[in-house]
Design a protein with these regions (language model features):
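Basic, helix-initiating cap at the start of DNA-binding domains
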Residues: 12-14, 18-63, 72, 76, ...
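An amphipathic alpha-helix adjacent to DNA-recognition modules
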Residues: 46-54, 61, 66-67, 78, ...
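Alpha-helical DNA-contacting segments of helix-turn-helix folds
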Residues: 60, 94-102, 144, 152-155, ...
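Append "Primarily bacterial transcriptional regulators
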Residues: 68-75, 84
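Hydrophobic alpha-helical connector segments
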Residues: 111-140, 164, 180-181, 189-193
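Short secondary-structure transition hinges
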Residues: 132, 136-172, 181, 211-215
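Amphipathic alpha-helical packing segments from all-alpha helical-bundle domains
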Residues: 153-178, 187-192, 219-230
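Amphipathic C-terminal alpha-helical segment
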Residues: 193-212, 227-238
Length: 244
């Protein structure tokens, strides 16, 4: 190889530099750094955060949580891994923000589904929207339950608020069945019912029980909700008769 010709895989410089000399590789390193600096200047911090989250979400959808790494995110967005840690505390922080996106999307789907009047129809619509969401985005939904914070690390308050918002949707749908002063009973019943819906959803998504398939899960959820709400109504009537 002619020593004055650039390295076959290296960048082209305006002057002839022997590729096997230290000076050539100094130029290469400088060239790469300048290129990266140029890319960085095109993105604001907010845009860069979104790029990181977009890449992380795409990796999780393709390969699950196990396939996520700072190096892979960096490769996809064209920045160094260190850039990720300038934007987020650590990889767990990145995952939490991806989870927040999932929770926001789920909350929007549920809110749209609840635009019906009858209490039972509202709860059924809420549960069916949950089922549909998990069926459409299984790896993102599984992320909510696969990811654990490191030992000693607390889940941030903003994340807890998003979880509580979802549960408040269930409470809002069931509220007409309870007297205003029965808030504790409403909370308990909402959690009991939603635990049942989540159990059916988990079995359907795992696809390990022949009797709980994705198709059958919608019927099972409707039966669960109608029977549970009927039981609440019967208990309420019984209580009223005793009081009377």
């Amino acid at each position: 190889m002619n020593p004055t010709v650039r390295h076959p895989t290296g960048p082209r410089f305006p002057i002839a530099v022997p590729w096997h000399t230290p000076y050539y590789w100094t130029l290469v390193i400088t060239f790469v750094r300048v290129q990266r600096m140029g890319r960085r200047s095109t993105h604001t911090p907010d845009q860069l955060r979104e790029l990181i989250l977009d890449a992380a979400q795409a990796i999780i959808v393709a390969n699950g949580l196990a396939g996520l790494s700072a190096r892979e995110i960096a490769r996809r967005i064209g920045y160094s891994p260190g850039t990720i840690y300038n934007m987020f505390e650590n990889l767990d922080d990145v995952v939490l923000h991806v989870e927040a996106r999932v929770l926001d999307a789920l909350d929007q789907r549920i809110e749209e589904a609840m635009r019906v009047d009858a209490t039972e129809d509202k709860v059924v619509a809420l549960a069916e929207s949950y089922l549909a969401f998990t069926s459409e985005r299984p790896k993102l939904w599984n992320l909510l339950f696969e990811h654990y914070m490191p030992s000693g690390a607390d889940t941030p308050p903003w994340y807890q608020q998003k979880l509580e918002m979802l549960m408040s949707r269930v409470e809002t749908a069931m509220a007409p069945l309870f007297a205003p002063e029965d808030h504790v009973a409403l909370q308990r019943s909402a959690r009991v019912l939603w635990a049942g819906v989540h159990g059916i959803t988990s079995l359907a998504t795992a696809n390990k029980l022949a009797s709980v398939t994705t198709d059958a899960s919608a019927i099972l959820v409707r039966d669960l909700i109608r029977n549970y709400l009927a039981g609440l109504a019967a208990n309420s009537e019984s209580t009223q008769r005793k009081v009377g």
